[in-house]
């Protein structure tokens, strides 16, 4: 991973998961069952370059939900919140 790249997993935005299970946003802006395509679409809508990969979150090795590598120079937590607000799949 190069400088300025952030790896995003769909579990970061999943309202069904607890924080201990990998959710990184508050439930009120989390989505119901997001997948890598939803995250990628949200990033493209925000104008952020990204690339999808067929990898899984280390804690969720049995779920092959994919991951997204986004080119972003700011803080990862700020990017995660921007993406969470842009994802269309809601509760």
Curated annotation (Swiss-Prot):
GO molecular function list: 7S RNA binding
GO cellular component: signal recognition particle
Pfam families: SRP19
A GO BP entry: SRP-dependent cotranslational protein targeting to membrane, signal sequence recognition
SUPFAM superfamilies found in the cross-reference section: SRP19 (SSF69695)
Main localisation: cytoplasm
Entry keyword set: Cytoplasm, Ribonucleoprotein, RNA-binding, Signal recognition particle
Subcellular location, record wording: Cytoplasm
InterPro entries: Signal_recog_particle_SRP19 (IPR002778), SRP19-like_sf (IPR036521), SRP19_arc-type (IPR022938)
Subunit (UniProt): Part of the signal recognition particle protein translocation system, which is composed of SRP and FtsY. Archaeal SRP consists of a 7S RNA molecule of 300 nucleotides and two protein subunits: SRP54 and SRP19.
Family recorded in the similarity comment: Belongs to the SRP19 family.
Function of the protein: Involved in targeting and insertion of nascent membrane proteins into the cytoplasmic membrane. Binds directly to 7S RNA and mediates binding of the 54 kDa subunit of the SRP.
Protein name: Signal recognition particle 19 kDa protein
Species annotation: Methanoregula boonei (strain DSM 21154 / JCM 14090 / 6A8)
Gene: srp19
